[in-house]
Amino acid sequence: MSSNKTEKPTKKRLEDSAKKGQSFKSKDLIIACLTLGGIAYLVSYGSFNEFMGIIKIIIADNFDQSMADYSLAVFGIGLKYLIPFMLLCLVCSALPALLQAGFVLATEALKPNLSALNPVEGAKKLFSMRTVKDTVKTLLYLSSFVVAAIICWKKYKVEIFSQLNGNIVGIAVIWRELLLALVLTCLACALIVLLLDAIAEYFLTMKDMKMDKEEVKREMKEQEGNPEVKSKRREVHMEILSEQVKSDIENSRLIVANPTHITIGIYFKPELMPIPMISVYETNQRALAVRAYAEKVGVPVIVDIKLARSLFKTHRRYDLVSLEEIDEVLRLLVWLEEVENAGKDVIQPQENEVRH
């Protein structure tokens, strides 16, 4: 069945999959952002000076401070560093995930999925292309971390051995620099693996979401409506109209729509009468039927909400257009005449070229 899934996923399929948590996301990229942000914060703002200051105060007071006061002070300093650190980690993990998912929350992924306990499905995942990809990725990561460790060892081995004669503060400063250097070197060595994994994950996700032609057709019917039902609906609309109304539509110069609730037909033949007349006057379902029939017989339908409402309020069928509205109606008639004449002028030279 999967071999028949050759069509690209539709926008609706991608949105539904994102709600289920099945959209493209590179977990390693999220972990890399989280690690980099956390280490950068600890190296930049983490310090033992405040903790050491508390100890100095206690010693200066001849240990008169109670254990409760000391614990409370240490707890306050810990919160001062821990809360921003946790918020930063939350942002560094959530923002890349939301960007990859198009800011769609996977609400349906929170529901329990009993099919995940199916041993057959587990066996399929065990021998899938994604498992092969993860195995190769793990080996590449291991190689890149070994390379990063070798680079850091060759570059910082002097600093490492110099700590044998250093004090506590000096050792803390050196290890802070070494930690940042090790993380940055590992990320730099693993950058290519990260990009390759993201590309492979994207193509595997798109492959899993591919649809067969029947699924695409079924989804189009759900979104746009079944063509057979739409055709039947048009036929019903036609049956709503009487033969007199159909005749009035055919003789109209144009139909002014609102765009679905009101349709007003304009009859205008200067050789018979100099003033336009209201030939069609329908609302709601009959208005939709008028539009459908006008499009069928080739009568222009112009959407002008303001004019349609005004004519509907002030006129009835077979009324002559009043002086208050005649300017707007004549403007539409002149514009329509110009458009039709321009179309004829384009067609005429083409016919002459064919004859020559």
Swiss-Prot record:
The keyword Transmembrane applies. It is found in: Cell inner membrane. The keyword Cytoplasm does not apply. GO terms for biological process: protein secretion. Its main location: membrane. Pfam families: Bac_export_2 (PF01312). Coiled coil: none annotated. Keywords: Cell inner membrane, Cell membrane, Membrane, Transmembrane, Transmembrane helix, Virulence. SUPFAM superfamilies: EscU C-terminal domain-like (SSF160544). It is a multi-pass membrane protein. GO terms for cellular component: plasma membrane. The chain crosses the membrane at residues 29-49, 72-92, 132-152, 179-199, 261-281. InterPro entries: BsaZ-like, T3SS_substrate_exporter, T3SS_substrate_exporter_C. It comes from the Bacteria. PANTHER family: FLAGELLAR BIOSYNTHETIC PROTEIN FLHB, SURFACE PRESENTATION OF ANTIGENS PROTEIN SPAS. Involved in a secretory pathway responsible for the surface presentation of determinants needed for the entry of Salmonella species into mammalian cells. Belongs to the type III secretion exporter family. NCBIfam families: FlhB_rel_III, PRK08156.1. This is Surface presentation of antigens protein SpaS. It comes from Salmonella typhimurium (strain LT2 / SGSC1412 / ATCC 700720).
